[in-house]
Amino acid sequence: MVNARDTLISLPFSAASGPGVEWRITDSYVAYEDALAAMEARAAAIADGTAPELVWLLEHPPLYTSGTSAKASDLIEARFPVFPSGRGGQFTYHGPGQRVVYLMLDLKHRRPDVRAYVANLEELIITTLAAFNVRGERREDRVGVWVKRPDKGDGYEDKIAAIGVRLKRWVSMHGIAINVEPELSHFAGIVPCGIEDSRYGVTSLADLGLPVTMHDVDIALRQAFEQVFGEVHGVADQMAETTN
């Protein structure tokens, strides 16, 4: 069966023109409050035309974030700090071993279509996972990217990557989180994305038996980004940057 969102990625999502996309990788853990403030400031500058678009790859220390649809009952145990994020969605976990990708893209100059943007984020994840022979799939009734788990039983699937976005003046914020090798037990403090069905769990590349490094994922992400969203260039060729 063809997912309705599959049809949304058929049109180009690249920018018609502009100074290019900055590609930034931060090696140290970034406090959530600092990341949120930096995102807000950069998104405003992009909207004002004073800064290029930015794709920021990072890791957070262990924490939970709540989206605009989060229910208090889905916070089972606040094992780690909880932050309101302003993005769509419900509760999620971020922590070491998870590649968080914050995308600040000017959709006004790309394609001002929220549903198409989310579909392209899904495609970014699916293409990245394919580099490691992992078949990620989108689901019409569940946000994120999923992998089938026949080893767990008929109809079982695990989420391997989460998606949460916010738009302000048609500039995107937040983005995706791919589970490379996080501590999966940390997800037990919440009902991830409000999904209570026991057939649907959480997995990672390591959990699937793949010895993939964060650097491997970063290379695959950049290749996938250029395929889905267009070339990064200019200051984007700084493949690694450490910020404090």
From Swiss-Prot:
Its main location: cytoplasm. It holds the Pfam family LplA-B_cat. InterPro entries: aa-tRNA-synth_II/BPL/LPL, BPL_LPL_catalytic, Octanoyltransferase, Octanoyltransferase_CS. Keywords: Acyltransferase, Cytoplasm, Transferase. Its EC number is 2.3.1.181. It is found in: Cytoplasm. Substrate binds at R87, G88, G89, Q90, F91, T92, Y93, H94, A162, I163, G164, G175, I176, A177. Signal peptide: none annotated. Gene3D superfamilies: Bira Bifunctional Protein, Domain 2. The record marks K159 as: Lowers pKa of active site Cys. It comes from the Bacteria. PROSITE patterns: BPL_LPL_CATALYTIC (PS51733), LIPB (PS01313). Catalyzes the transfer of endogenously produced octanoic acid from octanoyl-acyl-carrier-protein onto the lipoyl domains of lipoate-dependent enzymes. Lipoyl-ACP can also act as a substrate although octanoyl-ACP is likely to be the physiological substrate. HAMAP family: LipB. Belongs to the LipB family. In the reaction, the free carboxyl group of octanoic acid is attached via an amide linkage to the epsilon-amino group of a specific lysine residue of lipoyl domains of lipoate-dependent enzymes. NCBIfam families: lipB, PRK14341.1, PRK14345.1. This is Octanoyltransferase. It comes from Afipia carboxidovorans (strain ATCC 49405 / DSM 1227 / KCTC 32145 / OM5). The lineage of its organism: Bacteria, Pseudomonadati, Pseudomonadota, Alphaproteobacteria, Hyphomicrobiales.
